[in-house]
UniProtKB/Swiss-Prot annotation:
Entry's EC annotation: 3.1.21.-
Phenotype of the disrupted gene, per the record: Mice develop symptoms of the autoimmune disease systemic lupus erythematosus, characterized by high titers of anti-nuclear autoantibodies (ANA) directed against nucleosomes and double-stranded DNA, the deposition of immune complexes in glomeruli and full-blown glomerulonephritis. Mice lacking both Dnase1 and Dnase1l3 show vascular occlusions following bacterial infection: defects are caused by the formation of intravascular neutrophil extracellular traps (NETs) clots that obstruct blood vessels and cause organ damage.
Tissue: Expressed at high levels in liver, spleen and testes. Expressed at lower levels in heart, lungs, skeletal muscle and kidney. Not expressed in brain. Predominantly expressed in macrophages; at protein level. Secreted by mononuclear phagocytes.
Enzyme class: hydrolase
GO molecular function: DNA binding; DNA endonuclease activity; endonuclease activity
Subcellular location: Nucleus; Endoplasmic reticulum; Secreted
Protein name, UniProt field: Deoxyribonuclease gamma
Catalytic residues, chain numbering: E105, H160
């Protein structure tokens, strides 16, 4: 059988279109930067890697920011934006300092301004009768908008648990979900962060007590078999991404979720990688509105052709 002369060109065009759709997709990441404070800020090699990781993402959650002077994010903006006029500029939104007693951390979202904007935000208040103060660091809930993605609006609920109370904190995210829905008219949710959701902190028998896992409307993108830790001596799926909402679940780019091994990507030794963090980032992509529309048209066309043949 001979190939039509246009076949190679058509194949190349299809590959180009697929690559373009992947490029247009919005990459969302979650990264526990491990004790991100003054000492790490002075480690230039580690900071260079952190900036590279942030630049890979269109929107990234940064956790374990420990900086009472609030200099970390302004410093990052200076490194990301510089003084020149760039086509891509970054902005951020950051929580207040959260935690019990004197130990405090902050959540921060860094995002590309031309792709993402913040609609509104609030700190979840964990004051339920008989079940108070479950979270070590209450979620800093942010409602984002992106005009370029198939799903235009989505809420991100970040969480960094205390290892010993991970099971209860992860389960409590369902109450956060209910609270957000009662305040905002939105159905598309992303729960992401360092859940400490693996190994001894969340043993297999504990999953049956976690509503975020047992309720099928919550879709886990990072599976139990993943390793989000840098140390070779450990293999634990601590960092997770969970979605809720049919629209956002359907908008995920196939095979886009996973762990970003920056040690391998940037050819670092384990010691050099640990200077950056003891966690690898986790990520996934949301389809662009153009890709999503074209995919729906393609499916519709295939169905029509199939119907015509019957």
């Amino acid at each position: 059988m001979s190939l039509h002369p246009a076949s190679p060109r058509l194949a190349s065009l299809l590959l180009f279109i697929l690559a373009l759709h992947d490029t247009l997709a919005l990459r969302l990441c979650s990264f526990n930067v491990r004790s991100f404070g003054a000492s790490k800020k002075e480690n230039h090699e580690a900071m260079d890697i952190i900036v590279k990781i942030i630049k890979r993402c269109d929107l990234i959650l940064l956790m374990e920011i420990k900086d009472s002077s609030n200099n970390i994010c302004p410093m990052l903006m200076e490194k990301l934006n510089g003084n020149s006029r760039r086509s891509t500029t970054y902005n951020y939104v950051i929580s207040s300092r959260l935690g019990r007693n004197t130990y405090k951390e902050q959540y921060a979202f860094v995002y590309k301004e031309k792709l993402v904007s913040v609609k509104t935000k609030y700190h979840y208040h964990d004051y339920q009768d008989g079940d108070t103060d479950v979270f070590s660091r209450e979620p800093f809930v942010v409602w984002f908008h992106s005009p370029f993605t198939a799903v235009k609006d989505f809420v991100i609920v970040p969480l960094h648990t205390t290892p010993e109370t991970s099971v209860k904190e992860i389960d409590e995210l369902v109450d956060v979900y209910t609270d957000v829905r009662s305040q905002w008219k939105t159905e598309n949710f992303i729960f992401m962060g360092d859940f400490n959701a693996g190994c001894s902190y969340v043993p297999k028998k504990a999953w049956q007590n976690i509503r975020l896992r047992t309720d099928p409307k919550f879709v886990w993108l990072i599976g139990d078999q993943e390793d989000t830790t840098v140390k070779k001596s450990t293999s634990c799926a601590y960092d997770r991404i969970v979605l809720c909402g049919q629209e956002i679940v359907n908008s995920v780019v196939p095979r886009s979720s996973g762990v970003f091994d920056f040690q391998k990507a940037y050819d670092l030794s384990e010691e050099e990688a640990l200077d950056v963090s003891d966690h690898f980032p986790v990520e996934f992509k949301l389809q662009s509105s153009r890709a999503f529309t074209n995919n729906r048209k393609s499916v519709s066309l295939k169905k029509r052709k199939k119907g015509n043949r019957s």
